[in-house]
Amino acid sequence: MSSSRPGFSCSWLPYLLVLPQLAITAVFFLWPAGEALWYSVQMLDPFGLSSEFVGLSNFIALFHDEYYLASFYTTLIFSSLVAGIGLVVSLFLAAMVDYVLRGSRIYQTLMILPYAVAPAVAAVLWIFLFNPGLGLITHFLASLGYNWNHAQNSGQAMFLVVLASVWKQISYNFLFFLAALQSIPRSLVEAAAIDGAGPVRRFFNLVLPLISPVSFFLLVVNLVYAFFDTFPVIDAATGGGPMQATTTLIYKIYREGFAGLDLSSSAAQSVVLMLLVIGLTVIQFRFVERKVRYQ
C-alpha cells in the first residue's frame, strides 16, 4: 500500500508562509548584527553622524581595558553559577514532585509561578528581602551576627543577582525536567529496583541518562539566559556595582553604548559577545552532546 505525502497546490505558498518569520529574523537579528559588525571597525561620534574606519583598533583597545577583562571574568563566573545552580535545583525539585508528591497540582502550580514574574520585578522582590535596613532575611542574618549590605560588599552583590536570576529561571527548568521524568516508564525503574539498585544508583545510572537530551537542551538555554536575559535583574538589583563587581558583558555594552554613548566600543563588545556565545554553543554541540543518549 503506497502512501502519498500531502503537498501544496501552489509552489510559492511554503515560501509565503515562512516569509513573516524570515522578515522578523532579518529586521531584528541580521540587520542589527550587521550594523554591530560595521560599527565595530569604525570610530563614531556620540551621535553617530560621522565615522572613520579604524580597523581592529576598537577590539585591541578592549583587550587592553582592565575593566572589560574584569567584566569578561564576571560573566563567566555569573553564567556558570546561574546555569549550574539553576539546573541542579530544578532537577531536584522535579524529582521530588515525581517521586514524592506525584499528582500534586498545587505544588506544581506554585513552582511555575516565578516564571510569570518579570525579571526586574523578581530583582526588586529579592532587594526587599535583602534590604540592609528593612529586609526580613537581613534581619534574620543580623540576629546571627552577620552583617549584610550588598551595596558595599561585592560577594554579597553577586550572591543576590545569582539568587534572583536562578529563582526566575527555576520554573522553566522545572517544567521540562518534570515532563522528562514522568515520561520514563515506571517498569524500568521498578526493574532496576528489583535487581537491587538503590534510589541513588537508579537515579544516576538509569534516570539521568534517559533525561540527558532535556538536560542538554536546558544547559544551552540557561547559558543563553545567563548571558542575555539577566540584564534586567542586574540593572534593578545592583546596577552593575559595587565597583563593577556584577557588571557582565551585556551590562557593560549597555553602560558604554547607551549611558556613555561610546558606540564604537559597545559595538565591538557586542561582536565579541556574539562570537563567545557562538563558540560556547559549538563546544556544547561538539563535545557535550556526544554524552547525550537520545534513545
Curated annotation (Swiss-Prot):
- What is the annotated localization of this protein? Cell inner membrane
Q: Does the keyword section mention Repeat?
A: no
Q: What does this protein do?
A: Part of the ABC transporter complex UgpBAEC involved in sn-glycerol-3-phosphate (G3P) import. Probably responsible for the translocation of the substrate across the membrane.
Q: Which family does it belong to?
A: Belongs to the binding-protein-dependent transport system permease family. UgpAE subfamily.
Q: Name one GO biological process term.
A: transmembrane transport
Q: Which residue positions does the secretion signal occupy?
A: none
Protein name as catalogued? sn-glycerol-3-phosphate transport system permease protein UgpA
The alphabetical list of record keywords is: Cell inner membrane, Cell membrane, Membrane, Transmembrane, Transmembrane helix, Transport
What is its membrane topology?
Multi-pass membrane protein
Q: Which residues cross the membrane?
A: 12-32, 81-101, 110-130, 158-178, 208-228, 263-283
| Chain ranges of the ABC transmembrane type-1 domain | 72-284
Which ranges of this chain reside in the Periplasmic compartment per its record?
33-80, 131-157, 229-262
What's in the GO CC field?
plasma membrane
- Subunit structure as annotated in this protein's UniProt entry: The complex is composed of two ATP-binding proteins (UgpC), two transmembrane proteins (UgpA and UgpE) and a solute-binding protein (UgpB).
Which InterPro entries would you find in this protein's record? MetI-like, MetI-like_sf, UgpAE/MalFG_permease
Encoding gene, per UniProt annotation: ugpA
Positions on the Cytoplasmic side per record topology: 1-11, 102-109, 179-207, 284-295
